[in-house]
Amino acid sequence: MGREKKQEYALFTAWGASFIATLGSLYFSEIMKFEPCVLCWYQRIFMYPFVLWLGIAVVKKDYRIASYSLPIASIGACISLYHYVIQKVAAFSAAGAACGRVPCTGEYINWFGFVTIPFLALIGFITIAVCSFIVIKNK
């Protein structure tokens, strides 16, 4: 497979991850009526613009977006990881109890004993970061 095709597929995959993450986030808050905590809002702030930015980049085949999306996705992943640690590690849970009206330690979902909303966001951010790295590597 040629370099440009790899870039194209990686960029589309990154956009797809951001689109699915945004739809999932909106589903949980608007349909299921789960109120987001403060850290969830920060994760949304980092995730939602990717749908537009990466969507435009896919249409225009503008692979330069990867140099911006990689650091932004990495910051979002750090926020998600911190949120996940607050939920799952007892020693850190005291930090999340007073982060706003809704405690950051709350787990609206807990699939298979480890999949929570911050974990899903973390997977989305990691997917975007890895795809951005692939785009940069194949320039």
Curated annotation (Swiss-Prot):
Protein's name according to its UniProt entry = Probable disulfide formation protein C 1
The cross-references to HAMAP family, in alphabetical order and at most eight, read: BdbC
Q: How does it sit in the membrane?
A: Multi-pass membrane protein
Subcellular location, record wording:
Cell membrane
Disulfide bonds listed in the record: 37-40, 99-104
Q: Name one GO molecular function term.
A: protein-disulfide reductase activity
What are the UniProt keywords, alphabetically?
Cell membrane, Chaperone, Disulfide bond, Electron transport, Membrane, Oxidoreductase, Redox-active center, Transmembrane, Transmembrane helix, Transport
Q: Any transmembrane segments, and where?
A: 8-27, 42-61, 68-85, 113-135
Gene Ontology annotations of biological process type: protein folding
Describe its function: Required for disulfide bond formation in some proteins.
Show the InterPro entries listed in the entry. Answer: DiS_bond_form_DsbB/BdbC (IPR003752), Disulphide_bond_form_BdbC (IPR012187), DsbB-like_sf (IPR023380)
Q: Name one GO cellular component term.
A: plasma membrane
Q: Does the keyword Transmembrane apply?
A: yes
> Which coarse location class describes where this protein primarily resides?
membrane
What does the similarity note say?
Belongs to the DsbB family. BdbC subfamily.
